Amino acid sequence: MQARDPHVNVIFVGLMGAGKTTVGRAVARRLDRPFFDSDHEIEARTGARIPVIFELEGESGFRDREAQMIAELTQRENIVLATGGGAILRPENRKLLHERGLVVYLRANPHDLWLRTRKDKNRPLLQTDDPKAKLEALYEARDPLYRECAHFVIETGRPSVNGLVNMVLMQLEMAGIVAKPLQA
């Protein structure tokens, strides 16, 4: 990725529930760029929901599909991409994401993530007796990997989606990806 390349991909990473899809879709709208969610693309291609893929192929099989999808999507230019929470587990994915786009890590604390995901049955890694403890463990394990991959870290805290979008756009402006702040 070259600095000041207006066609660079904008890629969101972070744990499940961090807001990658919601914020990514809003950023894409504001930048008038196509939006892709790697998990949704996998579901569309396979015709199966993520939990079914996990059940039939295991996490390893799903991660293979995810790596293929990331490689394919990041060959495009000028897109906004939301990745799955575990996309950064493989070193080759982290390298590819970092090289083929400007990576924004939406960082949320485990408690906020739990509040956002506790009723979502489409998250196979949280189908445990203690999903909050699982999120805490995932956060501890993955936070360094997200940081390794990211160009920017945005603390999600409690701002509105529009507030987060504005923070992302400000970072993109400073990186030369957008010419000026875009108003909602």
Curated annotation (Swiss-Prot):
Residues binding Mg(2+), per UniProt: T21
Chief subcellular location: cytoplasm
Molecular function via GO: ATP binding; magnesium ion binding; shikimate kinase activity
SUPFAM superfamilies tied to this protein: P-loop containing nucleoside triphosphate hydrolases
EC number: 2.7.1.71
Record keywords, A-Z: Amino-acid biosynthesis, Aromatic amino acid biosynthesis, ATP-binding, Cytoplasm, Kinase, Magnesium, Metal-binding, Nucleotide-binding, Transferase
Pathway: Metabolic intermediate biosynthesis; chorismate biosynthesis; chorismate from D-erythrose 4-phosphate and phosphoenolpyruvate: step 5/7
Catalysis performed (reactions): shikimate + ATP = 3-phosphoshikimate + ADP + H(+)
Key word Protease present: no
GO cellular component terms attached to this protein's record: cytosol
Subunit structure: Monomer.
Similarity annotation: Belongs to the shikimate kinase family.
PANTHER family documented for this protein: SHIKIMATE KINASE, SHIKIMATE KINASE 1, CHLOROPLASTIC
Name this protein carries in UniProt: Shikimate kinase
Name of the gene: aroK
